[in-house]
UniProtKB/Swiss-Prot annotation:
NCBIfam families per the UniProt record, alphabetical: PRK04930.1
Function: Regulatory subunit of a potassium efflux system that confers protection against electrophiles. Required for full activity of KefB.
SUPFAM superfamilies the UniProt entry points to: Flavoproteins
Protein name in the entry: Glutathione-regulated potassium-efflux system ancillary protein KefG
Leading EC class: oxidoreductase
Disulfide bonds: none
Membrane topology per record: Peripheral membrane protein
Amino acid sequence: MSQPAKVLLLYAHPESQDSVANRVLLKPATQLSNVTVHDLYAHYPDFFIDIPREQALLREHEVIVFQHPLYTYSCPALLKEWLDRVLSRGFASGPGGNQLAGKYWRSVITTGEPESAYRYDALNRYPMSDVLRPFELAAGMCRMHWLSPIIIYWARRQSAQELASHARAYGDWLANPLPPGGR
């Protein structure tokens, strides 16, 4: 039996201590030998990102998971800075920028609103697939495979049992993250 794919889980939450949902989701990831959990706010509280180190981490993993809350229809500021600086031209895109080609990108998002708020006729005016389009485009720019996002809607209002169920499913996926024929 082959080894599971190496997963780099980039976790970005500026107030992690207050996010029960994200803490519960992270727990199974920390127990898997094929997963490297990398807390960006813990490593870079000053926003000075070690770009060569981050690019080396990306090279060492097949699956890159971006776990974060949805902030103003995007990601927290440090993750945006990370995306802009680390996924640079010549490394991840443009001429010679093929270091991530063929790898997998998956977004794991928590929201503060119910799924019903993400429709053309609802509060946010757009479905989540439209809101996450910039991330899908970034994956394409890097020549990565875009995997369907995992979205925990209205994370604060999930019961302990619901969060545990999400965490189990997430942990099961992390243990074997590639689709059939993915390698």
